[in-house]
A protein has these predicted regions:
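Conserved ABC ATPase "signature" region
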Residues: 97, 101-104, 109-127
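Conserved ABC ATPase signature
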Residues: 131-135
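Conserved catalytic motifs of ABC-family nucleotide-binding domains
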Residues: 152
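Catalytic Walker B motif of ABC-type/P-loop ATPase nucleotide-binding domains
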Residues: 156-159
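Helical segment within the ABC ATPase nucleotide-binding domain
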Residues: 171-183
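Conserved small/polar residues in nucleotide/adenosyl-binding loops
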Residues: 187-193
Length: 193
């Protein structure tokens, strides 16, 4: 995975420094970034997933320069935000199929196979006909992971991975991350994660 961050700064228009001279080398594998609310974790995450521009500094993800190669980075990146949203009109299968189409899977047979395999991997195959917004909290989280992984990204970034999950679902979710992704960056304010 290798993420390299050099002299990264983010200063908001009001003058607040969200990030100041951040230098970090994130190796391949699981990596957690732990810190209290307001420490800049979410700002750093938004920059890494190309949702926010840094004020200055350099970021490389798998050899791609974030400022010059955003399209390439989006192609290798899976992202699961803390407050993942589902389209109420889609069933679980349809939602994941839509994500697969957006990721560039154009052949119906290839897409169906990828969606079926991913639903099986995350334990949602039996509820594929249920509307996504009617799933339990843990099931929604797993569907979010499936959506982030459907295009087989090299890197997955997860914000507050177990927020809102009961203890049993937390364990299942952590195990799922270990099973389906070799390269995972977790942002959390919960040391248990």
């Amino acid at each position: 995975m290798s993420i390299t961050i050099k002299n990264l700064n983010k200063i908001y228009p009001n003058g607040n420094h969200a990030l100041k001279d951040v230098n970090l080398e994130i190796p391949t594998g699981m990596f957690g970034l732990l810190g209290p609310n307001g420490a800049g974790k979410s700002t750093l995450m938004r920059i890494l997933v190309a949702l926010m521009e840094p004020t200055s500094g350099q970021v490389e993800i798998c050899g791609y320069d974030l400022m010059k190669q955003r399209k390439e980075i989006r192609g290798i990146l899976g992202y699961l935000p803390q407050d993942f949203r589902f389209f109420a009109k889609y069933k679980t299968y349809e939602f994941l199929d839509y994500a697969a189409r957006l990721s560039g899977m154009t052949q119906n047979r290839q897409r169906k196979q990828a969606v079926d395999e991913m639903l099986e991997n995350v334990g949602l195959f039996d509820v594929r006909e249920r509307y996504a917004n009617k799933l339990s909290g843990g099931m929604k989280r797993r569907l979010g992971i499936a959506q982030a992984l459907i295009h087989h990204p090299k890197v997955i970034i997860v914000d507050e991975p177990t927020t809102g999950l009961d203890p049993e679902e937390r364990i299942r979710f952590r195990n799922l991350l270990y099973e389906v992704s070799e390269n995972c960056l977790l942002y959390t304010s919960d040391a248990a994660d």
